[in-house]
């Protein structure tokens, strides 16, 4: 029971020391697998760890946690003791080859080293993501909190020291490497800086459907076969150039160029142009008709004025003749009167 309580307290200490969020799917799977191993260790106490190995661990600061965990483990293990009275022939089973007890003995040291190395590896990344990014580095704006949480949860899959958990492959701008189960990770300072820049300038996949890179383009694949078959891509080549990225303010204001206008717009434009043409033609016809009418009226007026002048001239000539005739008539009347007077004087002597 000391070995079982040691494993339980060790995992609890690893959970407390890890700076990552344990609410992801990888954390739940690892805890479920750890529970399976603990159940196996309960029923295999004679074949478990020795007390010497359990006492020689490198956990001097966790005495209180080990004592409390051992008390709870005893209560859980000896709550029902009926299984201890059963007799079974265990010679048929080779538990060393079946459950890999050697791996279980070496698991605490490897888990401790991987936890320390990964904590040191991702500590500067968490500090840089918590800081405010400079305005010149991130052209898209502040990343949503959900992406940061996913990045913090994803590295926990590297810490699964179980034979049945899949390995995770990752790539950096300089080189690509695979993390084996329980292996140590050593990355220099030069390799950490490009990784932090990649976390800051990560393009969200919801910006545009055409710009979403595939798993091979991003340099991350889930299986070794797909990783070996795909060509190596760096984050600088997999991303689209900044000229092709739509600006956050101009993407909504400027619509896409369309190959053709909508039918309603073309019909209305044609109708408007036809109406304008008809109006212009009518205006020109009215102008020409008005000018012709004015010309006719002017010609008629000129003809009438000419005739009137001629008639006036004739009238004046006729008046002169009438005056002359009236004068002659008056002169003749006067002569006739004088002749009558002369004849009357001659008759009266």
Curated annotation (Swiss-Prot):
Post-translational modification: Ubiquitinated by SCF(BTRC) in response to mTORC1 signal, followed by proteasomal degradation and leading to down-regulate expression of SIRT4. Interaction with EP300/p300 inhibits ubiquitination by SCF(BTRC). Phosphorylation at Ser-251 by RPS6KA3/RSK2 in osteoblasts enhances transactivation activity and promotes osteoblast differentiation. Phosphorylated on the betaTrCP degron motif at Ser-218, followed by phosphorylation at Thr-212, Ser-223, Ser-230, Ser-234 and Ser-247, promoting interaction with BTRC and ubiquitination. Phosphorylation is promoted by mTORC1. Phosphorylation at Ser-214 by CK2 decreases its stability. Phosphorylated by NEK6.
Chain positions covered by the region annotation Disordered: 49-75, 204-271, 279-298
Domain bZIP span(s) in chain numbering: 276-339
Covalent link location (Glycyl lysine isopeptide (Lys-Gly) (interchain with G-Cter in SUMO2)): 258, 270
Any one GO BP annotation for this protein: integrated stress response signaling
Effect ascribed to mutating residue 212 to A: Promotes stabilization due to impaired ubiquitination
Residue positions of motif BetaTrCP degron motif: 214-223
Phenotypic consequence of gene deletion: Mice were born at a much lower rate than predicted by the Mendelian ratio. Homozygous pups generally die during the first hour after birth, although excess mortality occurs throughout the first 3 weeks of life. Embryos are severely anemic during fetal development, due to an impairment in definitive hematopoiesis. Surviving mice display defects in embryonic lens formation leading to severe microphthalmia in adults. Embryos show delayed bone formation and surviving mice display low bone mass throughout postnatal life.
Biased composition (Polar residues): 229-239
Stated consequence of mutating residue 230 to A: Promotes stabilization due to impaired ubiquitination
Modified residues (Phosphoserine): 214, 218, 223, 230, 234, 247, 251
Gene3D superfamilies: 1.20.5.170
GO molecular function terms listed in the Swiss-Prot or TrEMBL record: cAMP response element binding protein binding; DNA binding; DNA-binding transcription activator activity, RNA polymerase II-specific; DNA-binding transcription factor activity; general transcription initiation factor binding; identical protein binding; leucine zipper domain binding; promoter-specific chromatin binding
Family: Belongs to the bZIP family.
Subunit record text: Binds DNA as a homodimer and as a heterodimer. Heterodimer; heterodimerizes with CEBPB. Heterodimer; heterodimerizes with DDIT3/CHOP. Interacts with CEP290 (via an N-terminal region). Interacts with NEK6, DAPK2 (isoform 2) and ZIPK/DAPK3. Interacts (via its leucine zipper domain) with GABBR1 and GABBR2 (via their C-termini). Forms a heterodimer with TXLNG in osteoblasts. Interacts (via its DNA binding domain) with FOXO1 (C-terminal half); the interaction occurs in osteoblasts and regulates glucose homeostasis through suppression of beta-cell proliferation and a decrease in insulin production.
Protein name: Cyclic AMP-dependent transcription factor ATF-4
Species name: Mus musculus (Mouse)
Gene name tied to this protein: Atf4
């Amino acid at each position: 029971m000391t070995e079982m309580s040691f494993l339980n307290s060790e995992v609890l200490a690893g959970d407390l020391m890890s700076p990552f969020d344990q609410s992801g799917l990888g954390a739940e799977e690892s805890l479920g697998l750890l529970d399976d191993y603990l159940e196996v260790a309960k029923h295999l106490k004679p074949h478990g760890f020795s007390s010497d190995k359990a006492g020689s661990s490198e956990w001097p600061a966790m005495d209180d946690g080990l004592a409390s965990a051992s008390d709870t483990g005893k209560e859980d293990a000896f709550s029902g003791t009926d299984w201890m009275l059963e007799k079974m022939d265990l010679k048929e089973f080779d538990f060393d080859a079946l459950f890999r007890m050697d791996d279980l003995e070496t698991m605490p040291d490897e888990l401790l080293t991987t936890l320390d190395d990964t904590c040191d590896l991702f500590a500067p990344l968490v500090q840089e993501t918590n800081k405010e990014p400079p305005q010149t580095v991130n052209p898209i704006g502040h990343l949503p909190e959900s992406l940061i949480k996913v990045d913090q949860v994803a590295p926990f899959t590297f810490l699964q020291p179980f034979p049945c958990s899949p390995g995770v492959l990752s790539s950096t701008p300089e080189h690509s490497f695979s993390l084996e189960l329980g292996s140590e990770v050593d990355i220099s300072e030069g390799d950490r800086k490009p990784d932090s820049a990649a976390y800051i300038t990560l393009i969200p996949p919801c910006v545009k459907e055409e710009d979403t890179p595939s798993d091979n383009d991003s340099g991350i694949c889930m299986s070794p076969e797909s990783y070996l078959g795909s060509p190596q891509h760096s984050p600088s080549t997999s991303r689209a150039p900044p000229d092709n990225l739509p600006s956050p303010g101009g993407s909504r204001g400027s619509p896409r160029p369309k190959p053709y206008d909508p039918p309603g717009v073309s019909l209305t434009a044609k109708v408007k142009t036809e109406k304008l043409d008809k109006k212009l033609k009518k205006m020109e016809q009215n102008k020409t008709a008005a000018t012709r009418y004015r010309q006719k009226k002017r010609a008629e007026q000129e003809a009438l004025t000419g005739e009137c002048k001629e008639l006036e001239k004739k009238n004046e000539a006729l008046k002169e003749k009438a005056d002359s005739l009236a004068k002659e008539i008056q002169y003749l009347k006067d002569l006739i009167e004088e002749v009558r007077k002369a004849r009357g004087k001659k008759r009266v002597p």
